[in-house]
Amino acid sequence: MRSSNLTTTVHFLSPVFAAFFPSHGTEQEDAPIVRVKTAKGRKISSTNWIRRQVNDQYVSLAKKEGYRSRSAYKLIEINDKFKILQRGRFVLDLGSSPGGWAQVASKNTAIIDSTEPTVVAVDIQSMKDIHNVSFVQCDIDSDHDLLNEKLSGRKFDVVLSDMAPKSCGHRQVDHANIINLCELARDIALEYLNPNGSFVTKLLHGEYEQEFRRSIMTHFGVVSYFKPKSSRKDSSEIYLVALKFKG
C-alpha cells in the first residue's frame, strides 16, 4: 500500500496493539466495541452485539458442530467453491486464534494414519490445541526470524489469512488498516507457498484494493473475489482467492 494522507501507519500485530486487534472471526464476534451507556448501564453497541449473536444461525451452528467461531463457515464455503483444501495438502493459517479456520483446514487435509500435522497455525495470541494442527505463537510482523525457525524451511500448498484489525468505524481508515495486514499475509504467502499453491485473504473494498489485487495477479494464475453467504449482511468484507501460484 502506498503512503497516503491517512495518519495510520502502525504495525497492527505488535504486542502493544495485540489487545485491540482480533484474529479470526473479526465481525465483532468476540469483543464488541462499547460506546454509549443505556439507562440500565449496558452499552448500546454491546446490547446490539449480544442480540445479533443470539439471533445468528451460524453462531448457533458453530456451537452445535463444535467450531470455535462462526467464521469457520466462511472457509467451508470458500473451499466448496474453490477446492483449495484437499487430503494431504499442507496449510499455513495466519492469525489463527481462536481456531475456527484451523479446524476446517485440519478436517479437510488430515492424512489418515499419519502423525504429521498438515496445518500450521500462527497467532500472537494463544490458541487451544486442535488435532492435526501445529501451533506457533509469535508476531508474524516482528518475529519473522522466529517464524522461519519454527517452520524449518517447509513449504505449504495453501496460505490462509482471515486477519483484520478491529473496526474503528471510519471506512477509509479501516480499509487502509486491513490492506496493511493483507500485504503482510501476501509477503508470507510468496515466501512459503509451493508452486501452484493457493492464497486466501480477507479485505475491504476501497482505495488500495486494485493496487493490492494487481500485486497478487503478478504471482498467481487465477485471482477471484468471493463473498460467503455466512458473512454478516451488514459486513463489507470480501475474500480474495488466488490460485495457481507462479512463484
Swiss-Prot record:
Under Pfam families, the record lists:
FtsJ
Molecular function as annotated in GO: rRNA (uridine-2'-O-)-methyltransferase activity
Catalysed conversion reaction = uridine(2552) in 23S rRNA + S-adenosyl-L-methionine = 2'-O-methyluridine(2552) in 23S rRNA + S-adenosyl-L-homocysteine + H(+)
User: So what EC number does this one have?
Assistant: 2.1.1.166
Any one GO CC term of the record: cytoplasm
Annotated residues that bind S-adenosyl-L-methionine are located at G99, W101, D123, D139, D162
Protein name from the UniProt record: Ribosomal RNA large subunit methyltransferase E
What gene does this protein come from?
Answer: rlmE
